[in-house]
Amino acid sequence: MASLKKSLFLVLFLGLLSLSICEEQKRENEEDAEDENHEEESEEKRGLLDFAKHVIGIASKLGKRSEEKRFWPFMGKRSEEKRFWPFMGKRSEEKRFFRVLAKLGKLAK
């Protein structure tokens, strides 16, 4: 009877040991799967953030270009600034004024 008890305890112990090892491996596999899912989600978020940064960068460049047009003559100017750049075009009052100056200059010679 004693040998039967020993063998029964031995089988029970080995069965519980293998069961605990299997459960531990299962938990590790589940944690790995969760980590992979989390990494995939974070990669998707990173991809969306990169795309959003790209779109914002393009939008800001477009905004800068419209602002630069106000200040750079080769890109075009606002009509208020054109009056200060004679080669870009003059307002009608300035055209009249320059004609008068030209006539006065001819008379002075």
Swiss-Prot record:
<keyword id="KW-0964">Secreted</keyword>
<feature type="compositionally biased region" description="Acidic residues">
    <location>
        <begin position="30"/>
        <end position="42"/>
    </location>
</feature>
<feature type="modified residue" description="Leucine amide">
    <location>
        <position position="62"/>
    </location>
</feature>
<dbReference type="GO" id="GO:0005576">
    <property type="term" value="C:extracellular region"/>
</dbReference>
<keyword id="KW-0878">Amphibian defense peptide</keyword>
<feature type="region of interest" description="Disordered">
    <location>
        <begin position="27"/>
        <end position="46"/>
    </location>
</feature>
<keyword id="KW-0732">Signal</keyword>
<feature type="propeptide">
    <location>
        <begin position="66"/>
        <end position="70"/>
    </location>
</feature>
<feature type="signal peptide">
    <location>
        <begin position="1"/>
        <end position="22"/>
    </location>
</feature>
<comment type="function">
    <text>Fallaxidin-2.1 shows no antibacterial activity against Gram-positive or Gram-negative bacteria. Does not inhibit the formation of NO by neuronal nitric oxide synthase. Has no effect on splenocyte proliferation or smooth muscle contraction.</text>
</comment>
<protein>
    <recommendedName>
        <fullName>Preprofallaxidin-8</fullName>
    </recommendedName>
</protein>
<feature type="modified residue" description="Methionine amide">
    <location>
        <position position="75"/>
    </location>
</feature>
<keyword id="KW-0027">Amidation</keyword>
<comment type="similarity">
    <text>Belongs to the frog skin active peptide (FSAP) family. Brevinin subfamily.</text>
</comment>
<feature type="modified residue" description="Methionine amide">
    <location>
        <position position="88"/>
    </location>
</feature>
<dbReference type="InterPro" id="IPR004275">
    <property type="entry name" value="Frog_antimicrobial_propeptide"/>
</dbReference>
<comment type="function">
    <text>Fallaxidin-3.2 shows antibacterial activity against the Gram-positive bacteria E.faecalis (MIC=100 uM) and L.lactis (MIC=500 uM). No antibacterial activity against the Gram-positive bacteria B.cereus, L.innocua, M.luteus, S.epidermidis, S.uberis and S.aureus, or the Gram-negative bacteria E.cloacae and E.coli.</text>
</comment>
<feature type="propeptide">
    <location>
        <begin position="79"/>
        <end position="83"/>
    </location>
</feature>
<dbReference type="GO" id="GO:0050830">
    <property type="term" value="P:defense response to Gram-positive bacterium"/>
</dbReference>
<keyword id="KW-0929">Antimicrobial</keyword>
<dbReference type="Pfam" id="PF03032">
    <property type="entry name" value="FSAP_sig_propep"/>
</dbReference>
<feature type="propeptide">
    <location>
        <begin position="23"/>
        <end position="46"/>
    </location>
</feature>
<feature type="propeptide">
    <location>
        <begin position="92"/>
        <end position="96"/>
    </location>
</feature>
<feature type="propeptide">
    <location>
        <position position="108"/>
    </location>
</feature>
<keyword id="KW-0044">Antibiotic</keyword>
